[in-house]
């Protein structure tokens, strides 16, 4: 099921949440709407679902304009950040709920419902919890049950609003890898909202970077990371450094794109070591460059030659190995 978003705008009083948004999502794609709080990504997701009405523009599902269709008529599955499971129902009954609420003429028999629910619980690898209640589950398990419930009614489109935002970092990482594998199996057109660039990079086929109600860039994870369309995209997609030059330009580069040396070598610039922070397999070194207020961060492997006996206040020499020149505004 393809999705076309045509010239969609939305205001909340004087606040412009979306400004003339255009986006095509292909059938079977997993697309991330990525951006900071207030950028319009959740509003756009809610408009796709039919939970919000745009002030202008159209939403088209597979050639059919659904802009005036009620949310119940759009056949979308929705997974929220906070699970929204029924506390008084077992896992089985939560997943079966949507099937049992279908109109009588469309409702499958109880044996068919049972088979469908167990199929979905097996798919999310939690069939062994069918008789448990939500309060007996971990956060990650609850979110997988919420996803199974959304899939039970066989939606044409799956929408996920920060689905892993309420979980701890380790569980989030496990679940997003699981979601990427699951999407390959079910091949269902899916759109998910996130402010976590690592999550978007790991899960999505394409990323839509949003800021202040507009789309800054659309592309594959590799495209938006390696060829950012704007200063905003570059900074939002990962840690970054800014090195001022003397010709009304500055360089942008990532902490892992820095060469370090204890001695002065060609094209390397002197800087004072302000902090040395071991981070497991890597070490982050914070540097102060004469003539600019912004600090420079470099990340190197923990046994890098430049780190041996290094202390705060000493001089290191650094050079960006890859960078983007940008004109000062």
From Swiss-Prot:
It is found in: Cell inner membrane. Gene3D superfamilies: P-loop containing nucleotide triphosphate hydrolases. It comes from the Bacteria. Residues 3-237 form the ABC transporter domain. PROSITE patterns: ABC_TRANSPORTER_1, ABC_TRANSPORTER_2, CYSA. The keyword Kinase does not apply. ATP binds at residues 35-42. CDD domains: ABC_CysA_sulfate_importer. It catalyses: sulfate(out) + ATP + H2O = sulfate(in) + ADP + phosphate + H(+); thiosulfate(out) + ATP + H2O = thiosulfate(in) + ADP + phosphate + H(+). One of its GO terms (biological process) is sulfate transmembrane transport. One of its GO terms (molecular function) is ABC-type thiosulfate transporter activity. It holds the Pfam family TOBE_3. It is a peripheral membrane protein. It is an enzyme of class 7 (translocase). Its EC number is 7.3.2.3. Keywords: ATP-binding, Cell inner membrane, Cell membrane, Membrane, Nucleotide-binding, Sulfate transport, Translocase, Transport. The complex is composed of two ATP-binding proteins (CysA), two transmembrane proteins (CysT and CysW) and a solute-binding protein (CysP). PANTHER family: SPERMIDINE/PUTRESCINE IMPORT ATP-BINDING PROTEIN POTA, SPERMIDINE_PUTRESCINE IMPORT ATP-BINDING PROTEIN POTA. This is Sulfate/thiosulfate import ATP-binding protein CysA. It comes from Pseudomonas aeruginosa (strain ATCC 15692 / DSM 22644 / CIP 104116 / JCM 14847 / LMG 12228 / 1C / PRS 101 / PAO1).
């Amino acid at each position: 099921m393809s999705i076309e978003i045509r010239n969609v705008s939305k205001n909340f009083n004087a606040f412009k949440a979306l400004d003339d948004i255009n986006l095509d999502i292909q059938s079977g794609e997993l697309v991330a709407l990525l951006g900071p709080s207030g950028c319009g990504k959740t509003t756009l997701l809610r408009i796709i679902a039919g939970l919000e009405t745009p002030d202008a523009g159209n939403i088209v599902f597979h050639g059919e304009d659904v802009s005036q269709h009620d949310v119940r008529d759009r056949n979308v599955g929705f997974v929220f950040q906070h699970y929204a499971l029924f506390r008084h129902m077992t896992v089985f009954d939560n997943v079966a709920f949507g099937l049992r609420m279908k109109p009588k003429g469309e409702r499958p028999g109880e044996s068919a419902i049972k088979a469908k629910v167990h199929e979905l619980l097996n798919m999310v690898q939690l069939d062994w919890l069918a008789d448990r209640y939500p309060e007996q589950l971990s956060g990650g398990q609850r979110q997988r049950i919420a996803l199974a419930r959304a899939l039970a009614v066989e939606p044409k489109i799956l929408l996920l609003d920060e689905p892993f935002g309420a979980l701890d970092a380790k569980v989030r990482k496990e679940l997003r890898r699981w979601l990427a594998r699951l999407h390959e199996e079910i091949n269902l057109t899916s759109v998910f909202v996130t402010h976590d660039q690592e999550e978007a990079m790991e899960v999505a086929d394409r990323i839509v970077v949003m800021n202040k109600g507009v789309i800054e860039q659309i592309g594959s994870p590799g495209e938006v990371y390696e060829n950012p369309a704007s200063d905003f995209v570059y900074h939002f997609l990962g840690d970054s450094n800014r090195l001022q030059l003397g010709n009304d330009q500055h360089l942008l580069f990532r902490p892992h794109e820095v060469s370090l040396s204890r001695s002065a070598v060609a094209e390397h610039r002197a800087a004072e070591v302000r902090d040395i922070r071991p981070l497991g397999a890597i070490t982050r070194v914070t540097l102060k460059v004469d003539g600019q207020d912004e600090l420079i961060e470099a990340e190197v492997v923990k046994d890098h030659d430049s780190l041996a006996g290094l202390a705060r206040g000493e001089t290191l020499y650094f050079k960006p190995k890859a960078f983007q020149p940008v004109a000062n505004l």
